[in-house]
Curated annotation (Swiss-Prot):
The protein's name in its UniProt record: Threonine/serine transporter TdcC
Key words of the record: Amino-acid transport, Cell inner membrane, Cell membrane, Membrane, Symport, Transmembrane, Transmembrane helix, Transport
GO cellular component, one term: plasma membrane
Transmembrane segments: 22-42, 44-64, 97-117, 140-160, 163-183, 207-227, 261-281, 311-331, 366-386, 389-409, 423-443
Entry similarity comment: Belongs to the amino acid/polyamine transporter 2 family. SdaC/TdcC subfamily.
Amino acid sequence: MSTSDSIVSSQTKQSSWRKSDTTWTLGLFGTAIGAGVLFFPIRAGFGGLIPILLMLVLAYPIAFYCHRALARLCLSGSNPSGNITETVEEHFGKTGGVVITFLYFFAICPLLWIYGVTITNTFMTFWENQLGFAPLNRGFVALFLLLLMAFVIWFGKDLMVKVMSYLVWPFIASLVLISLSLIPYWNSAVIDQVDLGSLSLTGHDGILITVWLGISIMVFSFNFSPIVSSFVVSKREEYEKDFGRDFTERKCSQIISRASMLMVAVVMFFAFSCLFTLSPANMAEAKAQNIPVLSYLANHFASMTGTKTTFAITLEYAASIIALVAIFKSFFGHYLGTLEGLNGLILKFGYKGDKTKVSLGKLNTLSMIFIMGSTWVVAYANPNILDLIEAMGAPIIASLLCLLPMYAIRKAPSLAKYRGRLDNVFVTVIGLLTILNIVYKLF
């Protein structure tokens, strides 16, 4: 073998799939699987079998193409170690940096409000239905839970970071186990309700409207955008110097594709298992009760007549506990991002970016008071969680995940090679449909 052949062979071996690629595949997958997944079966199953089958077809393209677009934006910066804020500033100046900071903050903060409502409702339904205690005052419950989480965050942040990272995989395993365990309870109710003669494409309960609203919850549930910037920086530092940027882009796309496949497989199996165990009418009731699907499953098994199996009794309690842990995990992770974003905004606009004018402790205190105070107000008001996701959470995520990369591809010279592609049209349409949910909710 010649020297040149040896070099090519060595480079091919080094550039093949690495352990770090597997680690990042699982990391992206684990980031997306959180409390938001607990609401996807409700929205997906609300319209019955045909809409959820259409969502199954759309799930992977939405997850893959949208996150790949964001990764390409992150890859387009001249500095391999530059994050998304630096890249946007490079393309669009300081104004672009301010816009991305606002987008990141407002993409995460509404999620905290959603989780504040969710954890309050989940705890209250567990307290009343599984433990059998008298109802508590909602304002007191929300305040107690938020103060408890604030205490843990304030005094044990480093420990909680480790604990939450360890909880990702047990939570995913729990979802898969519950999905499998529900199989003996599957029934044909969702199939029996399919009447092809009475199906409507349009109208409030039509297939198109149901799938349109389902796109929002998919954007929300299949979302690992907060970690994409760190992921791209890591891969650029690992591959770009030796193999070039085009190779790094293909490697990032490959990792995102595999993570998306895993994510869609787990979430859609969980959604179908819930739908075949319950029914579209049950999903509508869960939406009206404003609780995640695991809490509804717990209540469903609690209300079963006759002799209950050991599994049914176990699931009745385990489902609510798993839901509470999942929501706390998601709340904590999003709190850290919101805190960092709000600290940056306060520093930028309140102190003109001068870090010497205010201590980190004071910044954290001011931000915590605003975050926890606003979350308590929303949790006490108890807006419908799915409506909140569709009207606030998902549209802001779509702005960051879909429309910002498409705008950059249109305007930035370093992204010109991606112009004119069909997948760009798909990502743009998904982003616009998600944002238009705001208009639909107003009328």
